[in-house]
């Protein structure tokens, strides 16, 4: 029981630093742009030819999806997102690699940042808008970026871990083959010691 509690405490302490830092960055960026963009003409600040900072409230999910269901979305998304965050935290506690730990921390940090918006403001504030010629990418925020970064880290960690496991399994298989051949030589050849040594080298 004590080792489990210790693990939970250490996981909470380590993840909290990452998650809280990401939430603070997300909330400060939203606060700054909410305070400054509302006074801009057209509620927009042009940064480059392909990047604008815009004043947008998202009543749907990430990147403005499902915003047409705004009359139901806030309560539903508050409940479902809270459940998802709790489940992700459970997975993070069980994570066995630094990559998966970091990935879950980023996803949780981004999700919590948007949850705070939805709880206190009734919608998520989005302000980053990429566009090129006739193509316009959905408006998003830093919390969405953190979620994407976390997912990328988790995918990379999954394939890296899978590769290590496969290589280890292959190594164990090769060792088993050598042992089987050595045993066969011992049983069939009195002078098998030299051959066994050559196999092991």
From Swiss-Prot:
UniProt-listed PROSITE patterns: SPASE_II
Pathway the protein acts in: Protein modification; lipoprotein biosynthesis (signal peptide cleavage)
Main location: membrane
Catalytic reactions on record: Release of signal peptides from bacterial membrane prolipoproteins. Hydrolyzes -Xaa-Yaa-Zaa-|-(S,diacylglyceryl)Cys-, in which Xaa is hydrophobic (preferably Leu), and Yaa (Ala or Ser) and Zaa (Gly or Ala) have small, neutral side chains
EC main group: hydrolase
One MF annotation (Gene Ontology) recorded for this entry: aspartic-type endopeptidase activity
Keywords: Aspartyl protease, Cell inner membrane, Cell membrane, Hydrolase, Membrane, Protease, Transmembrane, Transmembrane helix
Membrane-crossing segments per the record: 73-93, 97-117, 135-155
InterPro entries in the record: Peptidase_A8 (IPR001872)
One GO CC annotation: plasma membrane
Compartments where found: Cell inner membrane
Membrane topology value: Multi-pass membrane protein
Active site as annotated: 126, 144
Single GO biological process annotation from the record: proteolysis
EC numbers on record: 3.4.23.36
HAMAP family: LspA (MF_00161)
Function: This protein specifically catalyzes the removal of signal peptides from prolipoproteins.
UniProt-recorded name of the protein: Lipoprotein signal peptidase
């Amino acid at each position: 029981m004590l080792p489990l509690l210790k693990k939970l405490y250490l996981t909470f302490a380590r993840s909290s630093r990452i998650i809280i830092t990401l939430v603070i960055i997300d909330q400060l960026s939203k606060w700054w742009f909410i305070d400054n963009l509302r006074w801009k003409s057209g509620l927009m600040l042009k940064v480059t030819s392909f990047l604008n900072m815009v004043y947008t409230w998202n009543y749907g999910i990430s990147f403005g999806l499902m915003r047409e269901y705004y009359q139901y979305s806030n309560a539903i998304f508050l409940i479902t997102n809270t459940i998802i965050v709790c489940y992700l935290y459970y997975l993070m506690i069980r994570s066995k690699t630094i990559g998966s730990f970091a990935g879950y921390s980023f996803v949780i940090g981004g999700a919590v940042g948007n949850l705070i918006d939805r709880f206190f403001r009734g919608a998520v504030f989005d302000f980053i808008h990429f566009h090129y010629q006739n193509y316009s990418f959905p408006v998003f925020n830093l919390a969405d970026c953190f979620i994407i970064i976390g997912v990328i880290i988790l995918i990379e960690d999954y394939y890296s871990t899978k590769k290590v496991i496969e290589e280890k399994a292959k190594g164990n298989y090769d060792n088993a083959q050598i042992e089987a051949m050595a045993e066969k030589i011992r049983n069939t050849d009195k002078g098998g010691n030299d051959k066994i040594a050559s196999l092991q080298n």
